[in-house]
Amino acid sequence: MIYSNKVILEAKNISKYFGTITALENVNLSVREGECLGVVGDNGAGKTTLMKVLSGLYKPSKGELYFNGNKEVLESPRDSQNLGLEMVYQDLALAGNLPIGENIFLGREPTKNLGFFKMLDYKKIKEMSEAHLEKLKIHVKSADQKVEELSGGQRQAIAIARATAFNSNLVIM
């Protein structure tokens, strides 16, 4: 991996309050291209809250976020995804009753036009998800296999596959 001085993500003086509870206070963080960064701390220290702020799930009460040097206001996780930032949630956020391929594309499914209607393109979902799983060397029976049939490690791998399937610049876990 090649490391550079290019800062992909910078958080400046991030604070998050839930009523009278201070979950984060003046957190500063920067992540450079090619860098792997771990955030550690005690239970209740605010690690998950910080990750949810960075991924657009929570709006910071104070502070600023910069992506590739540009100040950004994240209104939703879709905003962070559009900037190339993806998150693998602690609970993995997988739908056990859906196949692997549909979990990878959940919310971003390729469609095909059928007159006035759009329908999910299941063939494309399967082809693209199998190609991505192969690229990541994730071995499963089929992209049609339901997530609930997978082991815990395989589920984690599928969550990572989803986070990396859409040209992410930064993956938060």
Predicted feature descriptions by range:
Residues M1-M173:
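Glycine-rich phosphate-binding loops of nucleotide-dependent enzymes
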